[in-house]
Amino acid sequence: MRIRIALFAAAFLAALALRVGVLLSVTTNYDLESFSTAVEILRRHGALYLETSRYNYSPVWAHVLLGLDTAAWRADSTLAQTLGGFLLLFDAATALLLARLAGGGRRGAAVALVFFANPVSIFVSSFHLQFDGVALFFLLVALWCAERPEPERGGTVAALSASLLVKHVTAFFPPLFVRTRRRREGLPWLAAAVPYAVFAASFLPYARQWTGIRAHVLGYRSLAEDYGTAMLLQIPGAPSWLPTAVFLASIAAALVLLRGVALRRACLLLSLVTLLTVPGIAEYYFVWPIALGALSGGAGYLVYTLAVTAFFLGSPDGLNLPLTHLPGWHGVWWSLLLWFALEVRRLEREGRAAPA
């Protein structure tokens, strides 16, 4: 027992050292420059959504950045290091929460380690300094509140609202928490709408900047890469709206089909569908299913992790190593499709094994 505990502790410390080492190697990147621009605009009380097209989120995150920048100045540090430390704390909290969701004990420690040592999570939080993991942490909090023996509906709604306020990558998840025949303790539809109302209300102080909000937040489509549904535009005569239409139709179908699926599995499958069909992509999006996937593991999770890690090694926005035959955008997409197919097959097997 002591040896096992020592091994787990050593593994967590090694993962922590790797995260800190990667963080200390980063001085700036494109997104950090965008964050700095948002901070500078807020400091002089400028028009956040009109003066730059590079801030695409709710105002809440901009004010978090302002606070982190102030803390960095007082500590004689940099925004990169302060932001990285902030993200590291949330990843550590995510690992602890995953351990609780996994039931604690040996399995809980293993699930926490699978996430905390995952190269994809390390790359996104410590190298890219992206904050998707913060939004996903609050999604996990909502899941934890919903799955308690006596579900905490208020906590679920608050956590879903916080997740959307941080980054609206979880915009399609609240309907999964609605009451169904299988999830009788789920949220009423009105309660599930609260996170959207909170997200919309966060923009009220910036109502005069509506044109910028519409263009840079609601109209933001990320990067156009040769990935997933964007390849539909290679079809001669394909309309420009086709990838978005396929994406929205896929999300709608998933929300309907997943109503009878256990909540944590439904959340994972929705994250996979979202990432498979999203019409615009950035490489840090690949962290979206990592925390949820750690709860179930499996061959699909492993293959996807390896594919994304190899992609980061060769990506110009990653380590840009001069190695040939590393997977590109298509390789990651196919690994994601494999993971999705394996999860669907697992779900079907569990359904057949369930008592009638």
Stretch-by-stretch model annotation:
Residues 90, 165-169, 310:
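Membrane-embedded alpha-helical segments of transport systems
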Residues 82-85, 114, 158-162, 166, ...:
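Hydrophobic residues within alpha-helical transmembrane segments
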Residues 138, 172, 282-310:
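Hydrophobic/aromatic-rich transmembrane helices and adjacent perimembrane loops
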Residues 2-148, 180-273, 278, 282-283, ...:
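Primarily membrane-embedded glycan-assembly and transfer machineries that use lipid-linked glycans
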Residues 296-356:
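C-terminal multi-pass transmembrane helix bundles with aromatic-rich, positive-inside signatures
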Residues 163, 198, 273-274, 289-293, ...:
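Generic hydrophobic alpha-helical scaffold/packing signal
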Residues 108-112, 136, 153-160, 171, ...:
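Alpha-helical transmembrane segments and their helix-entry boundary regions
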Residues 156-164, 169-180, 285-288:
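Transmembrane-embedded, aromatic-rich helix segments that form part
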